[in-house]
Amino acid sequence: MGRSLKKGPFIADHLLSKIEKLNDKNEKQVIKTWSRASTILPLMVGHTIAVHNGRQHVPVFISEQMVGHKLGEFAPTRTYRGHGKSDKKAGR
């Protein structure tokens, strides 16, 4: 179930203020954030945001197709290394 339109999208205040400052200066630099729950807004397009995945910051370049999604969707937290290999040689 989505968020109420009356409330508007969630975005962390510190992240929004950093992006607005960079937009005023017309600068592009990587912004580190731990706020995976923040919604991507149109004013973020063109910026690179380093989203924390629990271990490191994953750089995510924001494009127009990402607007409306959450930052955490683009920084996977789990690494799948495959299932264990079966040892068929030791059977005989």
UniProtKB/Swiss-Prot annotation:
GO molecular function: rRNA binding; structural constituent of ribosome
Pfam families listed in its UniProt record: Ribosomal_S19 (PF00203)
Record's GO cellular component terms: cytoplasm; small ribosomal subunit
Top-level taxon in the UniProt lineage: Bacteria
Keywords recorded for this protein, A-Z: Ribonucleoprotein, Ribosomal protein, RNA-binding, rRNA-binding
One GO process term, biological-process aspect: translation
PROSITE patterns hit by this protein: RIBOSOMAL_S19
Family: Belongs to the universal ribosomal protein uS19 family.
Free-text function comment from the UniProt entry: Protein S19 forms a complex with S13 that binds strongly to the 16S ribosomal RNA.
PANTHER family (alphabetical): RIBOSOMAL PROTEIN S19P FAMILY MEMBER (PTHR11880), SMALL RIBOSOMAL SUBUNIT PROTEIN US19M (PTHR11880:SF8)
Name the record gives this protein: Small ribosomal subunit protein uS19
Record lineage: Bacteria, Bacillati, Cyanobacteriota, Cyanophyceae, Nostocales
